[in-house]
Amino acid sequence: MFDVFSVVGLLATGPVAPVVESESGSLLFKILGSIVVGAPVLLFVVLGIASLLRDRPLSERTIVSFVQFGIAAGLVAAVAMLIFMLAWNDTQVPIEFGSWVHVDHNHDDEADHYHFVFKFEFDRLSVPFVILTFVLCGTIGAFANRYLHRERGFNRFFVLFSLFVAGMVTTSLAGTVETLFSGWELVGLSSALLVAFFHERPAPPSNGLHVWIVYRVSDAALLMAAVALHHMKGEGNFDKFLTGEWPAGGTLLSPNSAFFVGLLLLIAAMGKSAMVPFSGWLPRAMEGPTPSSAVFYGALSVHLGAFLLLRFSPILEQSPTLQGLIVAVGLATAVFATFSAAVQTDIKSALSFASLSQVGLIFAEIGIGFRYLALIHILGHGCLRTLQFLRAPTLLYDYRTMEDAIGERLPKISGAWLSRSPDSVRVWYYRLALERGYMDAYLKDYLVRPFLWTLRKCDSFERRWTNMLTNSGPAKERAPEAAQNMRSFYE
């Protein structure tokens, strides 16, 4: 396949290319990589500490200045990293920041039983994705400055926003499964909190809880995959189970091990990217502010599951069954999102389902093996959907202005096949789309309720056993408050 990095690198190795010692190049890469990773982390630390100073809070102008400087520094360093990688024909640049955990075997010194290296990987996949993150987050930050002007939660929004940027950068550049999981958790936490941003109303916290529950399922699957990889290889460094450079790499795992780990990774990606049957949380996430809807669920966070599959694509390709499952999930999600978008009455929900249909196609491309096509699709779709979300608040005004200018109502566009269908088919289609394929009802009846019933039974048994051992009277048997809230949320 055509390799832009290699072609440009070969051109740069001519007589005009600078000759740089490897030590100097490594030092430069480490400095630039430290800026890319450290800028959003430092931004979060500064804004987080400042938010704790209630007596002297930062002004809106100061907060925006910090955000602009932090994102601009990270973007410049990422672009500089890309330029030097092209010029020196480096398609993979690992950067390590030391070993945080190091446990040896008791019987020999041949290998480590557990080895946690804080490592980042700059390659053909991570560099474009992290540049996209900085570009879109910078755009959203400038938009949010005006959109949230004089809002009560202005400072809170940008604290969570900086946490999201740090999580996205960490996940994108992760070179170990532990580093990836830490960034994955930061993205999920900031996303759920921003869905519940307007906590004065009952709907945003409830929808934020729904998003958090789905993310917990996704996080559990990713954690199980990380534990399995540690059990198989002794550490989470990608080099221990992935060979070669992306996208032409391979895996050192056996087919059975690859299928098990790949299935867990697929579940994690499905939850993060709202694939069927976890698609119900995406329209609920629109309760958050428009800037967070644009950057999270329209451009970046919703693509994180696809990025995870691209990163571990050599493992997925070990199993044709797993690849077929990815294609099936992606196509089913695309079809589901297409007919659900047709009945939405607000533009943000319609755009969320439009994003979901494209992410479903991206999953199908990954399952087929079109890795570069999937990456290009992510980059283009993220930019387009961000523009549409930012345009949404003024679209209705412009729509009415256009109707006033032409003196009549604009015609409504509907599917040609649907307009020619019998009334019974159209009613059935509308009901199915309005109920979102009844997926939420099925999940509630066949997954959530049995799960909560099991937990309540375990809680009741534990209370009886405790009362018997302590010879105390019968305590009031009830589920904990958190379980009660979860039950009322789903019922």
Predicted regions and their residues:
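...captures the hydrophobic TM-helix bundle architecture rather than a specific catalytic motif
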Residues: F2-E491
